[in-house]
Amino acid sequence: MAVTSFAKGYCGKMFQDNEQALLKDLLKTDPEFAERFNNFAFDEVINEPEQGLDDRTRFMAILAVLIGSQALDAFNEIAPAALNFGVSAVEIKEIIYQAVAYLGMGRVLPFLNAANKILNARGVKLPLEPQATASTDKNMRRELGTQAQVDIFGENMRDFWKGGHINYWLADNCFGDYYTRKGLDYKQREMITFCFLAAQGGCEPQLTAHAAANMKIGNDKDFLIRVISQCLPYIGYPRSLNALTCVNKACESLQA
């Protein structure tokens, strides 16, 4: 089996100049595997009828699942390609920053370091322009975070922060520190959260809740299935099928 012309062309757009091409070495050492992966990920999946995404959204979702699944080597390959397809440095950083709330700094730090190296190699001046809209004031962060929760999940979240210190931190830290930032809008932030949760596994209740939140703000069921489909080559079938089950459960709960 040879790599299809479409897959070759798509990889050509992904990897420019002297950037390392995904599976380039494997085409020499493991040609049968590499040919099949390239054809599947960079042709069949992308061209599946009614399952596509625009390239920029696809790469944002893929970056999020790579962080969620701790795929640092693949992240180092895909992040430059994402830049080539129009994902901005700010958007990459915002994806990484928000990941801390869902994966913890221990798992995210290697990706932040990797992104800085990639951006430095591209000549991007660091630090980037500030994106925070909330001050460091604890009350302001909580108030703005609560409003973000209400905007996304509904009015039932208005007093959620009163249910103990973890719920307070969810309001002031997870939503107040991250969701209120510029660089990504609510729909993009909920999409990447869905990707973090789907990729890491073991948090299906939260994944179902965020699938419902996505639908409430306009990322409908069909969109989420497209996200799962485009990310499947990177996270595999079990977690993709689990994510699909969560999407179906969320849809059923909203229709009840």
Show the residue positions of the predicted features.
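Helix N-cap / loop-to-helix initiation motif
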Residues: 54, 88-91, 185, 218-222
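A short structural micro-motif
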Residues: 67, 85, 98-105, 198, ...
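Short, structured motif recognition centered on aromatic/hydrophobic residues
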Residues: 57-66, 75, 95-96, 188-198, ...
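Short conserved catalytic/interaction loops centered on acidic-Pro-aromatic/His motifs
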Residues: 76-78, 204-212
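Hydrophobic/aromatic-rich structural module bridging two neighboring secondary-structure elements via a short loop
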Residues: 78-114
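Acidic, glycine/proline-rich low-complexity segments that act as flexible tails and inter-domain linkers
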Residues: 1-56, 69, 76, 108-187, ...
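Extended hydrophobic/aromatic segments used for targeting, binding, or gating
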Residues: 209-211, 217-231, 235
